[in-house]
Amino acid sequence: MVFIVLVSAVASCLPALPAASPGGGQASSGVAGTGTGECGSGSWQPGWLEIHHIDAGEGVSTLVVSPTGQSMLIDAGEAAWDSDDGAKTVGAYVRSVLGCALLDYVLLSHFHLDHVGFPGQGGVWHLVHEQGFAVGKLLHRDLNRYAGAGGETLDAWRTYLQSDEALALHPEIATLGAGQVQLGGGVAFAFTAVDANGALAAGNFAADSAPPDENDYSIAALLRMGKLDYFTAGDLSGETLVSVSGGYSYHDLETRTAALVKDVDVYRVSHHGSSHASNVTLLAEMQPRVSIIQVADGNTYGHPAQSTVDRLVATSALYLTEHGNPSTNLRTGKVVGHVVLRTSNGIDYTINGDRFVASDPVRIDSDGDGYFVEADPDDHSATAVPALNGGCDATYETCP
């Protein structure tokens, strides 16, 4: 049984750096490159939580800036292994918001090219070693303990993270719960899924005929400020599917995670709106008021899927960075490029100027045991029974 522990985030305390981040958080020294710029001179204003879903085409990247200026970049991907286009787009955008090239945290949701890029060429590597970004802490999943159909990108990142070159990023394995990310300004941040929360067997299964897809190991996280709840989960899978011909298998981790997340206001849609994610159980538990899809025009995967769009617009306002699959009817969805959430009080918030009000109740730890009531072992079971969506893959998965 797994429970979420959420505590108020406090001011960042990270290694010393060439210059302070906008809110006083510190990023690491020893990063290649100069000219980091003056933090706080960008578009972000003190007192505001901003979450920027950057339109970088096929590459996914999200920038979080807390009311006190601590920053976190979630992913920075590329469309191809030999590309640095995504990194250049992300780097310029981040500088425009922060006014500098200092990041308190970088979070890698999982090791797919479109989320992290290829070391030595693009993505996060390019931001640090070519653009001179300084990073206080790099958080990632345990790719040495859990490995499936990750391919060359996973292998390259494993090698890179073991090199002296990666020390500049201060890498650290993410763990369930709160504490590793301290954004300050009344913002709480907790990991709700890391390496499938033990639902998948540990080991390196890369040589198997249909090992767990890298998406299955995606890191999921819940950010909270006041009444505003925001959920992001990389490309977390929402169905069980074994494809020997494709050389991978998906496992329904969304259903297992849903009970830990409960209601949210804003959902960064997993896997670009794929039909393999955002399942009925997850959406029924979360009931998002706003859903955001980061997707590229011209993608060859059919993202976003019509079925997923239909599920999302049934309960939420939908925003997309690009249209994606031209045959998908977006219904009431809006294509807006960069999708930006802003709030100063954790209640009233805007998405690209459209106004919303956070409707979740303020989460209260009524008995003082460190757990919010939604996942309090004294009051409510957080056990999630996986929906047998296509069955359970007993080869790798813990089945009921």
Regions found by a protein language model. Give the residues of each.
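Conserved Rossmann-like nucleotide-binding pocket used by diverse enzymes
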Residues: 9, 107, 373
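Flexible, acidic/histidine-containing loops and adjacent segments that form or flank the divalent-metal
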Residues: 35-50, 56, 93, 116-252, ...
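Active-site-proximal loop/helix segments of hydrolase catalytic cores
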Residues: 53-99, 107-130, 195-304
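Extracellular calcium-associated, cysteine-rich motifs in secreted modular proteins
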Residues: 362-400
